[in-house]
Amino acid sequence: MSTTKLTYSSGSSAKSKHSVRVAQTTADAKLHAVYEESGESGDSFDYSKSINATKSTGETIPAQAVTAYLQRMQRGGLVQPFGCMLAVEEGSFRVIAFSDNAGEMLDLMPQSVPSLGSGQQDVLTIGTDARTLFTAAASALEKAAGAVDLSMLNPIWVQSKTSAKPFYAIVHRIDVGLVMDLEPVKASDTRVGSAAGALQSHKLAAKAISRLQSLPGGDIGLLCDTVVEEVRDVTGYDLVMAYKFHEDEHGEVVAEIRRSDLEPYLGLHYPATDIPQASRFLFMKNRVRMICDCSAPPVKITQDKELRQPISLAGSTLRAPHGCHAQYMGNMGSVASLVMAMIINDNDEPSGGGGGGGQHKGRRLWGLVVCHHTSPRSVPFLRSACEFLMQVFGLQLNMEAAVAAHVREKHILRTQTLLCDMLLRDAPIGIVSQSPNIMDLVKCDGAALYYGKRFWLLGITPSEAQIKDIAEWLLEHHKDSTGLSTDSLADAGYPGAASLGDEVCGMAAAKITAKDFLFWFRSHTAKEVKWGGAKHDPDDKDDGRKMHPRSSFKAFLEVVKRRSLPWEDVEMDAIHSLQLILRGSFQDIDDSDTKTMIHARLNDLKLQGMDELSTVANEMVRLIETATAPILAVDSSGFINGWNAKVADVTGLPVTEAMGRSLAKELVLHESADMVERLLYLALQGDEEQNVELKLKTFGGQKDKEAVILVVNACASRDVSDNVVGVCFVGQDVTGQKVVMDKFTRIQGDYKAIVQNPNPLIPPIFGADEFGYCSEWNPAMEKLSGWRREEVLGKMLVGEIFGIQMMYCRLKGQDAVTKFMIVLNSAADGQDTEKFPFAFFDRQGKYVEALLTATKRADAEGSITGVFCFLHIASAELQQALTVQRATEKVALSKLKELAYIRQEIKNPLYGIMFTRTLMETTDLSEDQKQYVETGAVCEKQIRKILDDMDLESIEDGYLELDTTEFMMGTVMDAVISQGMITSKEKNLQLIRETPKEIKAMFLYGDQVRLQQVLADFLLNAIRFTPSSENWVGIKVATSRKRLGGVVHVMHLEFRITHPGVGLPEELVQEMFDRGRGMTQEGLGLSMCRKLVKLMNGEVEYIREAGKNYFLVSLELPLAQRDDAGSVKFQASS
């Protein structure tokens, strides 16, 4: 599937991916239709040719045919015979569908034999109460049916009422009720007994999970190799492979472990049609898919005739394989398979999706782990362990993605430096004639500059004549775009693509002037592909006709023969950055002035950046000194150079006595000394540890305490050259909670005296039994969560109490659930976890942050009977500490990067406006025209000021520095009115202004730009929420004079912005005063403006009266007076 884009914004990637999936779903449906027709006509199905035919033909397939194909994939009406299926109405358990083998597997009488005797029903028909088919253990089914998240309760152990035969019931919800997949329990699994459920099965993957978590970061290949090894150890399949899906939806085998006599597939690439989009959607719904015997005839489903469509089997573990897939498995010698989805986070993913490719919001299918076996095989209970293993694998992949994002960020910073370095040379020729050059920006085989009808070529490129032809084609067919990227010039419609051959297939083009371009070129993908599999005989005529991995590889090579590797978003962002700088810097600028202009801009940005760093540093010092969390800092040798008031208070050691002392040798207990040395060593290497426990010595008035126990985060301190010069420790005092918890974990008798004690020193405690059901919920946990003990006891801790759906205590996402499950499983296996970051939403929807410690619970014999969890509350102190930590040098540097980019992009057109205004000021203007120009100037100044507001926290926290300059009130009012004119005219509203002449001519001291910013925002909101039928909006200014100390006069200003109608929505007013539950864009603007007024020692009210509403802004500003010489002074009293 070719990808061609006319824009370079990575924000468009989600839309592009969605389009690719929709197109691929159509191709899947066409290929399936060809396969079905070949079966009906008796013709053999040539897989390779069919794939190419669906790609090359221009025929479209009706939407109804695509829908029918998707319906057949999900509602095929067939199940595998190794188990049986029941579908029931939720609540009543009335059977609405069953597989035709259900009666036999459950040892029920045939339907044709009438039920005799007491009316007890021993037959299976539509309408049967499914609960009557099982023993009393069926109560577990009823309990599961009431759960929001059924997955944590699966598999459920049940027994046939007739024969006591045990089954695993895997239950899930569908549109018309519940589906129960019943799989017979193997003799080897009878040791599990009724102790089924996810928590029990997860123990089977404990070793594999431990190994995954112990792997070093930065090596996805090693991660995949380890996963396939562990899956084979757990499941025993002959062949285990890890598939990765690429951006263009095709797949690649990236890891493999196999029986020595089986054919290798490592390195195999296969076309996207090998795993249809509909199948990928099903993997998102049902993450583990088992085929016990692909050659076994499937079993039909009988269902209630009242149902409008066939039962959905999208989430069923028994869904039968489609004929083409069974044939594919047979051709590769596989009889049984187990496929597990590898799902990761993806912020670019939209929710839902067209065709079969829709995916869950924020999640995407990264790849699959596929197991094959040469004989029939099923692993019922192990499947849940494998699914959990895949969740942990996804978590590790997400961590690797975070590392990759960090590397990408460094790459972007390096690229921006490289771009600026290029611009300091002869522009634009230096970016292709010197080293580094534009080929160093992105991975490519060649690059070219077409500038002023001249050519500069690097690497493998088209000829000069061909490049000129491509440029003319772009100008003619893509004249409205600023460039184009494609992995196939042929598919993009370039008529001369065939003449370029395989050497030039993909292209990224960036327009730098009206007729000049930068080009990057890539050769065909096939030269990048290496397959370690068996070489097939080219004379084997049947090789391409079979559905087999070799034919898939052959088809893939055919598909990508004239296509390059796709261009990644990060590469296009780098190209786009260069394009923006070149377009803004060189278009219509004389070469002789280029260096001067660039040096001036770079120096301007550098000075601004240093000022911002200085501001951040000053605020950091203030925050640290006044923080209510204990904060200390050491230099690179480990000597104290920071000791705030809180840590001095809890230790009893004044700051004057702490400064200069060794933290490791003098201030911590001996048992923490090694940890301090380790933290210091790691931080100096740039590795910052979190949630580490330190025990500080006590002094003076605190000497009676044994120690002060802090949980700290280490943060490296850096100088302006980015060198690490020390370490800052931001901590939380957990001394009281730690003492209580230590006593609790050592207690040998009845623990309830401590757990149920309402003493505030007792931390929140909850627990689970060995099956995962909540067994403890103490008063502190009741208070913290808002849920009473009797409401949660006996419910599944994960899935019913903590989860991501409508749970009692909702977690933020699937990753949070997986991490919590890992902690619980580790504790149940005897491995305690301390200070694990844990957060959930309480009963009122408040987000609670804490540190969790999980420990095993054992009986008198030492057998593990469950898990206890203790929470260290993320107090206001910790919250403030985290805020301080976030405001470190990393934030400052990040801010500099953002400012440099945004200013470059937005200030360029602003410079154009300023230049135009400057030209106008040199011409003969009337008084009105001069006023218009002056109004434009103060509006420009307002834009520049807003562009500088990168850190809204400084406004929210009240420490933004305001400018104090002399200004004329009339100029402010002109600027405010001008910003409301266009919107008011669009709504046919008259803007009524009441500003007395003496106020217009009044000179005041204050922050003119901030004043006009807030007044304009209030005015525009008034206009926005005034119906056109009301005809008017008004702004009125009233003043009164006050005298301070007999010297300075202060003007009390009252601005009343009035509008008729119902007024602003109440939710928006609440947001303005920070009382709303959320924050819209308009609410954020109003809130910031209210805080700016407060910074100016003013107040804002929003008042509703009969038929009208108004903003009332009150503030006081010093009055200025001009003398005859034009200088300004404060107006003194007469």
Swiss-Prot record:
Histidine kinase domain residues: 901-1121
Keywords carried by this UniProt record: Chromophore, Photoreceptor protein, Receptor, Repeat, Sensory transduction, Transcription, Transcription regulation
Molecular function in Gene Ontology: phosphorelay sensor kinase activity; photoreceptor activity; protein homodimerization activity
Native source species: Selaginella martensii (Martens's spike moss)
GAF domain boundaries: 219-401
Domain of life of the native organism: Eukaryota
Protein name per UniProt: Phytochrome 1
Ranges of residues in domain PAC: 690-746
Binding site for phytochromobilin: 324
Family: Belongs to the phytochrome family.
SUPFAM superfamilies documented for this protein: ATPase domain of HSP90 chaperone/DNA topoisomerase II/histidine kinase, GAF domain-like, PYP-like sensor domain (PAS domain)
A Pfam short name: PHY
Subunit-level organization: Homodimer.
Domain PAS: from-to ranges: 616-687, 750-821
CDD domains with a match to the protein in the record: HATPase_Phy-like, HisKA, PAS
PANTHER family cross-referenced by the UniProt entry: OS08G0260000 PROTEIN, PHYTOCHROME 1
GO BP terms: detection of visible light; red, far-red light phototransduction; regulation of DNA-templated transcription
Alphabetical list of InterPro entries matching this protein: GAF, GAF-like_dom_sf, HATPase_C_sf, His_kinase_dom, HisK_dim/P_dom, PAS, PAS-assoc_C, PAS-like_dom_sf
UniProt function note: Regulatory photoreceptor which exists in two forms that are reversibly interconvertible by light: the Pr form that absorbs maximally in the red region of the spectrum and the Pfr form that absorbs maximally in the far-red region. Photoconversion of Pr to Pfr induces an array of morphogenic responses, whereas reconversion of Pfr to Pr cancels the induction of those responses. Pfr controls the expression of a number of nuclear genes including those encoding the small subunit of ribulose-bisphosphate carboxylase, chlorophyll A/B binding protein, protochlorophyllide reductase, rRNA, etc.
Protein modification: Contains one covalently linked phytochromobilin chromophore.
